[in-house]
């Protein structure tokens, strides 16, 4: 029979080893989390959601403003209505694609991070795994360039609505309010190329333009386009983070897969 003091000491030692083992396991698991990819995933989800949701509603509001004020003849803006409807369907596709792609990128980030940090023993990777990582690097670069174009394109309606809003502010200003020159301050939507030059009326002036700026459709569409543009910018930043993370992981995997590799990053 062992003394009670020795038995208690052994039990305390076993408990401390178990706690230490649990702590080391938690640290090991946390070390395998791709924090850069995780931040990029949250940012990408938020950006795509803002762009798709706000952009869809803003496009519908833009069509309503054009039909009610700038182009009363349906045949004049028929092509624009079809293009906007097509863009709304494209938005559905973008949201679905990025929902899947970002999840796959996050899973790939967990795989490559675990392999790079050798969390499961010695370094293990296959040629197929490195090929898949390289494919994700290429796709992410292509999507990053494409979203730069989307970000620039989403700034166009913001610029257009800002010009209309600033013109309305000029009409409301005390310097021009009540003068005969107010009715000569106009906005010609045809100059932006979204409706043909023969569209009627195409140009709105004075108090009629001020009434348009006071409508809920204009207010909501203007601010939703701003939020959609910000969402596109957030998506670009997320893809840039993905580019850096995937490129670094692929480079390390490629380097460590060499037989003559003797240096570790």
UniProtKB/Swiss-Prot annotation:
Modified residues (Phosphoserine): 257
Entry's localization field: Membrane; Cell membrane
Glycosylation sites: 73, 177
GO CC field: membrane raft; myelin sheath; plasma membrane
Protein topology in the membrane: Multi-pass membrane protein
Transmembrane stretches, start-end: 31-51, 90-110, 136-156, 224-244
Protein family according to the UniProt entry: Belongs to the myelin proteolipid protein family.
Protein name listed in UniProt: Neuronal membrane glycoprotein M6-b
Phylogenetic placement of the source organism: Eukaryota, Metazoa, Chordata, Craniata, Vertebrata
């Amino acid at each position: 029979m062992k003394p009670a003091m020795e038995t208690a000491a052994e039990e305390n030692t076993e408990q401390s080893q178990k706690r230490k083992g649990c702590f080391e396991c938690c640290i090991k698991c946390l070390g395998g989390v791709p924090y850069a990819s995780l931040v990029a995933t949250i940012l990408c989800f938020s950006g795509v959601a803002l762009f798709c949701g706000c952009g869809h509603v803003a496009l519908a509001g833009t069509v309503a403003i054009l039909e009610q004020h700038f182009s009363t003849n349906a045949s004049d803006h028929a092509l624009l209505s079809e293009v906007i409807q097509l863009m709304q369907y494209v938005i559905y596709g973008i949201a679905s694609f990025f929902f899947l792609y970002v999840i796959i990128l996050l899973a790939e980030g967990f795989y490559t991070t675990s392999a790079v940090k050798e969390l499961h023993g010695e370094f293990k990777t296959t040629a197929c795994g490195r090929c898949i990582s390289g494919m994700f690097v290429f796709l992410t670069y292509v999507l990053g360039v494409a979203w730069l174009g989307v970000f620039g394109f989403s700034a166009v309606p913001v610029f257009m609505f800002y010009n209309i809003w600033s013109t309305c502010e000029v009409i409301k200003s005390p310097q021009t309010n009540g003068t005969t020159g107010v009715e000569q301050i106009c906005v010609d939507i045809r100059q932006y190329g979204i409706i043909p030059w023969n569209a009627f009326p195409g140009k709105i002036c004075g108090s009629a333009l001020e009434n348009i700026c006071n409508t809920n459709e204009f207010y909501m569409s203007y601010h939703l386009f701003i939020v959609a543009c910000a969402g596109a910018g957030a998506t670009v930043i997320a893809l840039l983070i993905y580019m850096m993370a995937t490129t670094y992981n692929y480079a390390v995997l490629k380097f460590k897969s060499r037989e003559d590799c003797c240096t570790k990053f």
